[in-house]
Amino acid sequence: MQTDTRLQTSNYATKPVTKAPAWHGLVAWDMLLNGMTTGLFLVAALSELVAPDRVAAVAQAAYPVALLLLLVDLLCLVLDLGDPLRFHHMLRVFKPSAPMSLGTWCLTIFAVPLTVAAALSLLPAGGMTLAWVRRLVVVIGLLPALGSAVYKGVLLSTNAQPGWKDARWLGGYLTNSALMLGCAEMLVLSVLMRHVSAAAILRPALGLLLVLNLVPLCLLAVDLRTTLSRLYTRWQLCGVGTLALGGGVLLPLCLLLVVDSPLSMLSAVMCIALGSLVIRFVIIMLPHASA
């Protein structure tokens, strides 16, 4: 009898999950906005700490934008949860071993220094004291911002859903993608503010991050190759690859490195954002396509 019970348990444990989660387009937008707000904060903070003379003005404008993106991201997250109290319920217990719990706490803690940095950035210039206080605040926010950027990829890759469970490089891709998106947003701000010295640093940096982002993206594609080949035809995969790689990497890379104009830089950033959104939609829809 005990042997039969163990056998039944073993057979049940090895069965694939057939019910896809009720996660759709809002989650893809949530993933994109999460990368945009955390990436913008991280790039702005690191830029201000490393090259304050050339980037501080753009970084100061970036913190309120990052806060606005965080609020929109949280709105998407709450709408997707269906019940606003669910987010509050996840804060009742701190469980570092659970990606959902750790990520929720990182996101909540990250909101505090981001809000303070945004508020300080909106105050009139107060000399070196105000600038150093803001830099201290952003240093405090670096670790929770990084945790917020990482956790969604770890959460999905440790899930039992088809496709997600094989995406071992999803956390690495989303983290690197967040830095790339943050650098792209900083470039947009520098162009809009006509800050030439900041744009001169951020443009080649974005090109480098675009190339580096190909490494985790290709490794993620290798993780998902079996699932993708089973779910999509060759032509469908070619279409997704054209949008994600051609439109999201090669075209913006050419616009950044070959054409030197504000319009080309803004167009490159738009292509990067659209390519990133396409990849996130494909990732979110994997369990639905497998069902």
Feature map (PLM): residue ranges:
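A cytosolic-side transmembrane-helix exit/cap motif
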Residues: V78-G82, L219-L228, I283-A291
